[in-house]
């Protein structure tokens, strides 16, 4: 990257994009959120609100499930979200 292009990036606060450590750490943080944090939150949300969700909330959650599908598939084999059945007396 030439000196002129680096100088042009300084006013916009994008000089950190030149440093590969900052770039790689940003990728790691965003990838971790995409694959781990948000899918686990979605599993938690769906498990707690499955029977009381409204139609717009359900539509929004299904959209997020579609968006974060790789992370959902990553955790699906390890999480049991089946509802409790009726106990026999």
Curated annotation (Swiss-Prot):
According to the record, the segments passing through the membrane are: 29-46, 59-79
EC category name:
translocase
Membrane topology label: Multi-pass membrane protein
Organism annotation: Prochlorococcus marinus (strain NATL1A)
Which GO molecular function terms does the record list?
oxidoreductase activity, acting on NAD(P)H, quinone or similar compound as acceptor; quinone binding
Catalytic activity reads: a plastoquinone + NADH + (n+1) H(+)(in) = a plastoquinol + NAD(+) + n H(+)(out); a plastoquinone + NADPH + (n+1) H(+)(in) = a plastoquinol + NADP(+) + n H(+)(out)
Q: Tell me the protein's name.
A: NAD(P)H-quinone oxidoreductase subunit L
Chief localization class? membrane
- Subcellular locations according to the entry: Cellular thylakoid membrane
